[in-house]
């Protein structure tokens, strides 16, 4: 039956090789055999061993669902666990990126001014979207910005991010703040509590941009004192008014007693950089956070003249408080497990529909395909990260579900209202495509009713995926098999996805017109000739940005960037 084959995604992906390992688990590259796309599958194991780790994972997958933007890494799918109550690992499918910005900087000592400009533009455009949602990343650094050889950047790793609400306390404790010191704003030096402010991310972007310009970190401090010394060596000693806003007493006392230092002209520190770039950099690295521009203000800087365009730099509506109610309450591991399961259902529309309607029976058949998928991961690790011989299946028909049924129970009732029973406004998960946009908002329709990247949140249920799978959802029904088939067919037709976007593939010897608006609407049944003409028009480069996407354009100063080892997601 189609219903039973809709959710078994383990057979959908063919594992290629290990591209990253860490304390959290393993990342493998894979092929989506339904679409042919290359993806990265992150296995996160024992996620409920520590409550803080589970909350971080929940925070990240929730934010990546809510923040759909071309310059933010996309979760394409999360595999359905074998049961609602007993799962310990999750498999998260990301779009595959070649490397990260740290490796790009390390492997390239000849990045051009066009590279510099385009890199900063993408980072600020993503930051504008993030900040207008009232989200602060708090851990921006080159390793947390994924990159492709065609110069496409995407921000990732939202595990330390926070959402600010109007009624949150003015001072927020950052006991988990462990971000790299080199990219930490001066007001955070030595502090584990501060006021939420988008200026902390702006400072980090300034440090990253300076590193792009020079090829090495700007403030590689060995400790807090050394970090402050490096900052003041370049920027000069801050005013007493600025010093009083430093929350750490030792840092404040040290800056107050510091000998007077004059700022170093940025033209001396960065002699080869574009003067317009240095003017903007100086604003990004203002010692006083109130003097730093917002991401939107930075995008309007003259440095981006001819490149920036307001219609392809969207804002995001603020995230609703209900989405992050778990951050404001004391929750148990079982609470977080239920919330993570709820997030996973965003990528399984039919199950989510039953869950939201209260008709979900919480009975899942354990598909043997997931066992086979786990063996593929284990086989890769045993073979040093390379795919050896195919792992044989235990049974001939591995796509068929096992006969055993795992029953799960709901979270026991508590004195307080269960936070998982509240239905927040949501952005549905996207089963997605694999092509990384090179021009702003490639493949994006501003009008599609089921477009999860719309600026305005869409409370309508997402279209059910048309991809086949072998996950089985066991549901009891008094109706006959024929009536059930008709009901399922009716549901599938109701949520049939429409084409609201158009592929714009990158081809050799062409680059994109970055000054053209990339918002466009394509009908579900567009004429083939019209589609081809539109694609051709959007892939024609116009100087001086011809070749800025680094896909072999005619602009001979821009080339495909080199990169080192692929990073972990």
From Swiss-Prot:
Regulation: Activated by threonine and tyrosine phosphorylation.
EC numbers: 2.7.11.24
Keywords: ATP-binding, Kinase, Nucleotide-binding, Phosphoprotein, Serine/threonine-protein kinase, Transferase
SUPFAM superfamilies: Protein kinase-like (PK-like)
Chain positions covered by the region annotation Disordered: 404-432
Protein name: Mitogen-activated protein kinase 8
Motif TXY location, chain numbering: 175-177
Enzyme class: transferase
Domain notes: The TXY motif contains the threonine and tyrosine residues whose phosphorylation activates the MAP kinases.
Active site residues per record: 139
Domain of life the protein comes from: Eukaryota
GO cellular component, one term: cytoplasm
The reaction(s) this protein catalyses: L-seryl-[protein] + ATP = O-phospho-L-seryl-[protein] + ADP + H(+); L-threonyl-[protein] + ATP = O-phospho-L-threonyl-[protein] + ADP + H(+)
Species: Oryza sativa subsp. japonica
Reported modifications of this chain: Dually phosphorylated on Thr-175 and Tyr-177, which activates the enzyme.
Induction pattern: By heavy metals, abscisic acid (ABA) and infection with rice blast fungus (M.grisea). Down-regulated by high temperature and UV-C.
Modified residues (Phosphothreonine): 175
GO molecular function: ATP binding; MAP kinase activity; protein serine kinase activity; protein serine/threonine kinase activity
PROSITE patterns given in the database record: MAPK (PS01351), PROTEIN_KINASE_ATP (PS00107), PROTEIN_KINASE_DOM (PS50011)
Annotated Protein kinase domain residues: 13-304
One annotated GO biological process: intracellular signal transduction
Binding site for ATP: 19-27, 42
Positions bearing Phosphotyrosine: 177
Protein family membership: Belongs to the protein kinase superfamily. CMGC Ser/Thr protein kinase family. MAP kinase subfamily.
Positions in coiled-coil regions: none
Tissue expression profile of the protein: Expressed in leaves and panicles.
